[in-house]
From Swiss-Prot:
Top-level taxon: Eukaryota
Role: Urotensin is found in the teleost caudal neurosecretory system. It has a suggested role in osmoregulation and as a corticotropin-releasing factor. The non-hormonal portion of this precursor may be a urotensin binding protein, urophysin.
Propeptide: 49-71
Subcellular location: Secreted
Name of the featured protein: Urotensin-2
Annotated source species: Platichthys flesus
GO MF, one example: hormone activity
Cellular component terms (Gene Ontology): extracellular region
Disulfide links within the chain: 77-82
Amino acid sequence: HPITESAEMPYPGPASLEERGVGSLDDLSLSEQNYPPQRGAGLRYATLEVLLEKQSLLNPFSRVFGIRKQFAGTTECFWKYCV
């Protein structure tokens, strides 16, 4: 049986190393999934705001929505348009 144990030992060894490697890759992917997507989400929101601003330049109705988003309660005026 010590022969089978010695024969079995090398196989679990590399397998455990592979599992550790995969685990480290999973940890990296998890950390990437946790942190950069939040930054990406922030960038997405920023691009959404920029797109809304561009649409507000083209569409007066979206200007009204942008005003209510930005100045919710203080003033409802944006450039020459007041609500």
